[in-house]
Amino acid sequence: AKAGFDAWDFSMFDMCKYDWSAGCFLPNDNPLASDNYLAFARRLKQIGLDNGILCNQSHAPFPSRGPIIPYLKRALECTAEAGGKICIIHPDNYLSAQENAEMYFDLLPFAKECGVKIATENMWGWDTEKDQSSFAACATSASFNEHLDVVNDDFFVACLDIGHAEMRGSGEGAANMIRALGNRLQALHIHDNDCWHDSHQIPFSMSIDFDAVVKALKDINYSGYFTLEASSYLEAFTPETTQKGLCDLAASAKRLSDMFEAL
């Protein structure tokens, strides 16, 4: 809040820790893994409100398969308790739209009980021979819209990861995908990269054309938040200087918002 943000994104990646090679969960002292996970979510909400910011959206743990699935409902619960309206739940990278829809169909009744929309996201794989990203679920406009069409529910929307959309090999370009998604696009993950790797860097620091991105958002009358997913930028800061990094990130989001309003 002191950095200048007006909302916070509830990331729940550490809600569960699973050793895929051993086939078992790992010890986890994260409050979201405890029996008091809802109380923790309520506490975060109150801290935000006490400082003048609200939870706008969240991110469930991933990958969305097997033993992780039960935690996706917990993520929806926590989103509701924190005050968030959208929970991003990854599709399985390598399943079809029809196969991924089965998971979303299972989750949607509970999401509606919670009053939280589910957003799917554009993913990517990696082609080691070509040394570039490769197709994964929702990576193209056609795949993304197919996922949305199969589920066909007002509580199932799109979160476009701007960086993923710009990665060489899989992405179609963020501006193209924004226009293809239209009013189904209700959430964003914004970060910068070299249009090759998934860098999750601060906007305006690398190669993405944010003028084109913002123009496309304006063209579809986007009405959601400009939510950053640029935590890699903070890795260069120490605990003592992290506030400066947060201020930089907030300033980049404000710049995007100002660009949008100026059009």
Locations of regions flagged by a protein language model:
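Histidine-acidic metal/acid-base catalytic patches
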Residues: 1-7, 13-16, 25-26, 42, ...
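A conditional alpha-helix N-cap/helix-loop micro-motif detector
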Residues: 37, 68-69, 97-100, 137-140, ...
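Histidine/acidic residue-rich metal-binding segments in metalloenzymes
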Residues: 103-111, 149
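Structural motif corresponding to the early beta-alpha repeats
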Residues: 3-102, 112-117, 218, 223, ...
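Short, structured loop/turn "capping" segments at alpha-beta junctions
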Residues: 114-120, 154-159
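Surface-exposed cleft-lining segments at the edges of enzyme active sites
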Residues: 88-97, 123-136, 164-166, 198-201
